[in-house]
Amino acid sequence: MSSRPQNIGIKAIELYFPSQYVDQVELEKFDGVSAGKYTIGLGQTKMSFCDDREDIYSFALTATSKLLKNYNIDPNSIGFLEVGTETLLDKSKSVKSVLMQLFGDNTNIEGVDTINACYGGTNAVFNAINWVESSAWDGRDAIVVAGDIALYAKGNARPTGGAGAVALLIGPNAPIVAEPGLRGTYMQHAYDFYKPDLTSEYPYVDGHYSVNCYSKALDAAYRAYCKREAKQANGTNGVTNGDASTKTGLDRFDYMAFHSPTCKLVQKSYARLLYHDYLANADSPVFAEVAPELRDMDYEKSLTDKVVEKTFMTLTKKRFQERVNPAIQVATNCGNMYCGSVWSGLASLISVVDNKDLEGKRIGLFSYGSGLAASFLSFRINGSVDKISDVLNIPSRLESRRAVPPETYDQMCDLRKQAHLQKDYTPKGDPSTILPGTYYLTKVDDMFKREYAIKE
């Protein structure tokens, strides 16, 4: 019997985001809010968006086709393909089925779509890894596509939008290895963010409650992860940062990526994990300056307590800049990609940090989707990621985008609203703004069938 696959994980990454963005400083002025409300309060710099020329099908087609092309992947070498998204164009037909046109005669590909707010991409990654680990595996690789177009009605939530998609090649002998058995998951019923109105792209959101749900999910998923890790107890849980007097459990992760509704929430969430370390070992010299009453604080109160937040944000400030900030460069410049968010964070990290500083390092990753579903997992860099970094080329691609004024962004939001669920429709957006190699919508016929072209 042949040996089972080893070092299963991510072998290649492609990232797509639209060619245009709105500057959050300009959006603050346009919305008439105080300076810094979006840029400092939310931690957002720019926000990607698209008009009616692009949709989740075009995003997924672009990301997947570029993954195949840029890594010279034979379409016949793919045996599993799954899509995570909450941007629905059809209540029956999957985005995955649309992508099948990229695979020619290779029709033997498992997987469909997986949906739960921003968590679908992570569930698709789990399904892909599980497939490679299973008796169903036929020796081929898997692809996961995670992406969305995040839009909100006018108001406080609109600056937390964004757009983009990530395509991941998953298989054995990967340079970014998913650490076997190390996952912690938390699932609950909650109405924090949901989309019951299928005639609209806009969600119903209880913002403060959703942040509370996110924090609870982070706590529970991290605790579940730590319990799994402790059970393994095989000597692989060593700390790579700090000495005995400065290390904490958080230091076992050299880098971290989070689902990023806003970059400010990511910063608070990283600090929250150190609070867990404090509760587990409050007598450590690391926490000598922490007020002792924080140890016995009621859990519900701790979720919103400003002293807890400020104390641990201060303690993690330097580590955040070194270990987490590289993973939010896409989020602060593109906004929230929903299902693609945490995976664009991983892409950002790989693209921004030098390969020599990544080899052999551990990456913690937290994924959250409202409603709610959340997981904490980890990867280890097992070899060079130079090829992935070169293909992603994120900093220069972000720099080459086109800024549009908030007035234009507002008009394009209205245009998408008018185009939503239309049939016998020709998009009104300007195709000249779309970059070469990008799929875009050309027509929706009277049977709702959608037609696309590739920008030459």
From Swiss-Prot:
One MF term in the entry's GO annotations: hydroxymethylglutaryl-CoA synthase activity
Induction / repression: Expression is regulated by the Zn(2)-C6 fungal-type transcription factor FgSR which binds directly to the promoter.
Active site: E86 (proton donor/acceptor), C118 (acyl-thioester intermediate), H259 (proton donor/acceptor)
Catalytic activity entry: acetoacetyl-CoA + acetyl-CoA + H2O = (3S)-3-hydroxy-3-methylglutaryl-CoA + CoA + H(+)
Residues where (3S)-3-hydroxy-3-methylglutaryl-CoA binds: A35, C118, N156, T160, S210, H259, K268, N336, S370
Cited InterPro entries: HMG_CoA_synt_AS, HMG_CoA_synt_C_dom, HMG_CoA_synth_N, HMG_CoA_synthase_euk, Thiolase-like
Pathway(s): Metabolic intermediate biosynthesis; (R)-mevalonate biosynthesis; (R)-mevalonate from acetyl-CoA: step 2/3
Function as written in the Swiss-Prot or TrEMBL entry: Hydroxymethylglutaryl-CoA synthase; part of the first module of ergosterol biosynthesis pathway that includes the early steps of the pathway, conserved across all eukaryotes, and which results in the formation of mevalonate from acetyl-coenzyme A (acetyl-CoA). ERG13 condenses acetyl-CoA with acetoacetyl-CoA to form hydroxymethylglutaryl-CoA (HMG-CoA). The first module starts with the action of the cytosolic acetyl-CoA acetyltransferase ERG10B that catalyzes the formation of acetoacetyl-CoA.
Keyword list, A-Z: Lipid biosynthesis, Lipid metabolism, Steroid biosynthesis, Steroid metabolism, Sterol biosynthesis, Sterol metabolism, Transferase
Top-rank taxon: Eukaryota
PROSITE patterns hit by this protein: HMG_COA_SYNTHASE
Enzyme class, spelled out: transferase
Enzyme Commission no: 2.3.3.10
UniProt record similarity statement: Belongs to the thiolase-like superfamily. HMG-CoA synthase family.
Pfam families: HMG_CoA_synt_C, HMG_CoA_synt_N
SUPFAM superfamilies registered for this protein in UniProt: Thiolase-like (SSF53901)
GO biological process, one term: ergosterol biosynthetic process
Name of the protein in question: Hydroxymethylglutaryl-CoA synthase ERG13
